[in-house]
UniProtKB/Swiss-Prot annotation:
Protein name: Ribosomal protein uS12 methylthiotransferase RimO
GO cellular component: a single term: cytosol
Residues that coordinate or bind [4Fe-4S] cluster 2: 172, 176, 179
InterPro entries reported in the protein's UniProt record: Elp3/MiaA/NifB-like_rSAM (IPR006638), Methylthiotransferase (IPR005839), Methylthiotransferase_CS (IPR020612), Methylthiotransferase_N (IPR013848), Methylthiotransferase_N_sf (IPR038135), NA-bd_OB-fold (IPR012340), Ribosomal_uS12_MeSTrfase_RimO (IPR005840), rSAM (IPR007197)
The MTTase N-terminal domain, residue ranges: 26-141
Cofactor(s), names only, from the UniProt record: [4Fe-4S] cluster
Residue span, Radical SAM core domain: 158-399
Enzyme class (EC, first level): transferase
EC number(s) given by UniProt: 2.8.4.4
Subcellular location: Cytoplasm
NCBIfam families: 30S ribosomal protein S12 methylthiotransferase RimO (TIGR01125), MiaB/RimO family radical SAM methylthiotransferase (TIGR00089)
Length: 470
């Protein structure tokens, strides 16, 4: 998902105003594309730029150079990133490229970005703060005596002030046949647990009301360091998902905030966090990428291949935590997928009654081993299966949302306008899930603002969103 291009620092309401305050400061424009993990990389780069005294420009022509943080996972993302680089070159002329596309090579082994746009100043891969800053220093020397203490402890965020992403690790140890992330971001590297907790505390102190825990594989947190014991506030704390989630939940409770978990690979120890969700330590929301339900397709994907066990676990999770929302993603039309295998997936979706699902028609990704599998399906078959999948999934979602009519839900308000408010319940992550549309307040005592929690009585529902009143 692209941010405004170039992106202006979210702590500065008027980019031109920030520029006028320090006309002598070198100015950097910023374009951020891709997933929440890439957004965190962008936040780290912008934080470092500000710490070193650079101003962040809100326009191309107001910038001395532009940094483009790219996505390279699927073909559409590659093209979007290449187009953004081209636009920045046309509008500004001085461009540094970072992110996943920067790590991709073409069939001949040449850097894709430099091949298409040879005029870029520098190209780095993802999670490359040091390399990006070195390139910036080379082409736009940093100012003298920066006021580093002007940068807030929480860093600079590109999200609204009331929610933020907390990245706990980088890279992935899995080798799913459809994915090239390990080749771009490397194997799993877990952040020290005390560092993660300190960032979380700083975010809560800065007013964040919802913390979204992200990584390529949240469940694997700490595997690379053998679950080493760290220390937080003088107490031992294991570098392990369960212990981290419990500690984050306790910390969030002190600030009346939410913690939401994303990218939770279905390892057995995921079962340990369901009681924490039921006890209110973290939101009863589990983003677990299942990808398919037929064992043969899962084997070709190099994913866990026991759908019956997955169904049993889902039942057990809901028995422990009845309010649990389960989100997942799936791929339709994977190479070799038969009609019978696809029907198994549809049957699974109907039986599992997952609350939130996304489905992609399989798209070959350059460098993925799945490209070598036999049985590639025509585009029209892949798209037709994706549409059939979503028809079933949306019917399930509509039924589950209808059950919420008449209930009172805790809602975090994202936006207030003349038509009322727009917010999200515990079942809704920003950008990817549904919304709760809140009627305008009838009394002064019912007024609400963005970033506040309100209790909303649900009066209506469709297949994706809810409507209600305070």
């Amino acid at each position: 998902m692209p941010c405004q291009a170039p992106h202006s620092d979210s702590n500065v309401k008027n980019p031109s105003e920030a520029t006028n305050q320090k006309d002598h400061s070198p100015r950097v424009g910023f374009v951020s594309l891709g997933c929440p993990k890439a957004l965190v990389d962008s936040e780290q780069i912008i934080t470092q730029l500000r710490a070193e005294g650079y101003a962040i420009s809100g326009t191309y022509d107001g910038a001395d150079l532009v940094v483009v943080n790219t996505c390279g996972f699927i073909d559409e993302a590659v093209q979007e990133s290449l187009d953004a680089i081209g636009e920045a070159l046309t509008e500004n002329g001085k461009v540094i490229v970072t992110g996943c596309l920067g790590a991709k090579k073409d069939a001949a082994g040449h850097d894709i970005v430099s091949s298409v746009h040879p005029k870029v100043l520098a190209v780095t891969g993802p999670h490359a703060l040091g390399e990006v800053m070195q390139a910036v220093h080379t082409h736009l020397p940093k100012p003298h005596d920066p006021f580093t203490d002007l940068v807030p402890a929480a860093g600079i965020k590109l999200t609204p002030k009331h929610y933020a992403y907390l990245k706990i690790s980088e890279g992935c140890n899995h080798r799913c046949s459809f994915c090239i992330i390990p080749s771009m971001r490397g194997d799993l590297v877990s952040r020290p647990v005390a560092e993660v907790m300190l960032e979380a505390e700083n975010l809560f102190k800065a007013g964040v009301k919802e913390l979204l825990v992200i990584s390529q594989d949240t469940s694997a947190y700490g595997v690379d360091v053998k679950y080493r014991t760290g220390f937080w506030n003088g107490r031992p704390l294991k570098t392990r998902m369960t212990e981290l989630v419990a500690a984050l939940g306790e910390l969030a409770a002190q600030y009346g905030a939410w913690v939401r978990l994303h990218y939770v690979y279905p390892y057995p120890h995921v079962d340990e966090i369901i009681p924490l969700m039921n006890n209110g330590h973290v939101l009863p929301y589990l983003d677990v990428p299942l990808q398919h339900a037929h064992p043969d397709v899962l084997k070709r994907m190099k994913r866990p291949a026991n759908a019956e066990k997955t169904m049993d676990r889902i039942r057990a999770w809901r028995e422990i935590c009845p309010e649990l929302t389960i989100r997942s993603t799936f791929i339709a039309g994977f190479p070799g997928e038969t009609e019978a295998e696809f029907q198994t997936l549809l049957d699974f979706i109907a039986e599992a009654e997952l609350d939130r699902v996304g489905c992609f028609a399989y798209s070959p990704v350059e460098g993925a081993t799945a490209n070598d599998l036999p049985g590639a399906l025509p585009d029209e078959v892949r798209e037709e299966r994706r549409a059939r999948f979503m028809e079933v999934a949306e019917a399930v979602s509509a039924r589950r949302l209808q059950r919420k009519v008449g209930q009172t839900l805790r809602v975090l308000v994202d936006e207030v306008n003349q038509d009322g408010g727009i917010g999200r319940s515990s079942a809704d992550a920003p950008e990817i899930d549904g919304l709760v549309y809140i009627a305008p307040p009838q009394r002064t005592s019912q007024r609400y603002r963005a970033g506040e929690f309100v209790d909303v009585r649900i009066t209506g529902a469709d297949g994706h969103d809810l409507w209600g009143e305070v």
